[in-house]
Amino acid sequence: MTYSDAIIKRITSLCIEKEITINKLATLSGITQSTLNSMINGETKNPKLKTLRKIAMGFNMTVSELLDFPEMNELEFEDE
């Protein structure tokens, strides 16, 4: 699993858990729908920390909480 795959999995699972759509998350996060869609579709391979912070805020959590999940903690980083 790549870094971007792990981020996509985390965002989609949190949307399911919190019962919000990707569109609603974009609104709550203050980012454009196209930016979030690019991430979810794997077009954005390395999202900026600023974007991750906004997404975390949309979920009402910190960046640390957003990135603290088993797949990310077990990920061995390689050049993508």
Set out the residue ranges of the language-model regions.
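A short, Lys/Arg-rich alpha-helix, primarily the initiator
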Residues: 1-21
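Conserved hydrophobic/aromatic packing and binding residues within compact polymer-binding modules
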Residues: 11, 25, 36-39, 66
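The alpha-helix within a helix-turn-helix
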Residues: 15, 26, 56
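Recognition helix of helix-turn-helix/homeodomain-like DNA-binding domains
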Residues: 31-46
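Short, charged recognition helix plus adjacent turn
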Residues: 38, 67-80
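DNA major-groove recognition helix of helix-turn-helix/homeodomain DNA-binding modules
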Residues: 50-65
